[in-house]
């Protein structure tokens, strides 16, 4: 169980997770196409859980994406099928579609029960799970239902572990709080790292935003193609984007090129070769990059080449 916590940003709680002897885990995603490489981090983590004996359920969140203005249900189901084809190259998971779940009255009963135990302020605070600021949700009341539905997903599926990026933290913490009030199983939250936008975060001084909201605001996004490496990008596109990416010397925090190396390539593609040095752990690369042993140019060259190799295995 300890090894399953490698390349994990946070687990709530570690003790609860280590007490598990198998069980079930879930992740929900809005079906968009093309996906970016940030999705691969949680996909590989799900595959590790599956290999360790967990029942892994992937919720293709069509209704959630529709609420979030990402397209019609029909379009979203079609996108979901394409995403599944990529995920099938990483692991074999059970899939559930949000619009199928929404046909069950018991699901909506859960949504209402969760709403009864949650303040409006708490719901608004949980909206960064949508990739939106809390102030944006007042444009459309349905968006306030999104966090409630995400919590209902966890209880409806009856899973032990809720998996997601750090941007999903508030919804998962809401689920843990509400579980106690409703007498339901409290889910363990397992949060994987987020890859920052290739353009960086800009000046964040004085924003006073919580870390999960920062992740939601500055992560890679398919809607901003130059901020992300897309699964459909050509080798030329990948190399151009990496060479143009924000990658300050001696700085690893919110450095997207370092994050790609440490969170995706080294754990799931293999050791990274940089100028005769072989990095088998992200910590070793972090140390050398911070000390200037590895330069931004050297890091970009190695990351671009390794990333092209990884994506070649996943393209449809």
From Swiss-Prot:
Organism per entry: Pyrobaculum aerophilum (strain ATCC 51768 / DSM 7523 / JCM 9630 / CIP 104966 / NBRC 100827 / IM2)
SUBUNIT field: Homodimer.
Assigned EC number: 6.1.1.1
SUPFAM superfamilies: Nucleotidylyl transferase
Record's catalysed reaction(s): tRNA(Tyr) + L-tyrosine + ATP = L-tyrosyl-tRNA(Tyr) + AMP + diphosphate + H(+)
Claim: Nucleotide-binding is one of the keywords in the record: yes
GO terms of biological process kind: tyrosyl-tRNA aminoacylation
Localization terms from the record: Cytoplasm
GO cellular component: cytoplasm
Entry protein name: Tyrosine--tRNA ligase 2
Binding, L-tyrosine: 26, 146, 150, 153, 168
Chain sites annotated for binding ATP: 222
Motif 'KMSKS' region location, chain numbering: 219-223
Coarse class of the protein's main subcellular location: cytoplasm
InterPro entries xref list: aa-tRNA-synth_Ic, Rossmann-like_a/b/a_fold, Tyr-tRNA-ligase, Tyr-tRNA-ligase_4, Tyr-tRNA-ligase_arc/euk-type, Tyr-tRNA_synthase
GO molecular function, one term: tyrosine-tRNA ligase activity
Coiled coil: none
Gene: tyrS2
Class of this enzyme: ligase
Top-level division of the source organism's lineage: Archaea
Family: Belongs to the class-I aminoacyl-tRNA synthetase family. TyrS type 4 subfamily.
Keyword tags: Aminoacyl-tRNA synthetase, ATP-binding, Cytoplasm, Ligase, Nucleotide-binding, Protein biosynthesis
Role description: Catalyzes the attachment of tyrosine to tRNA(Tyr) in a two-step reaction: tyrosine is first activated by ATP to form Tyr-AMP and then transferred to the acceptor end of tRNA(Tyr).
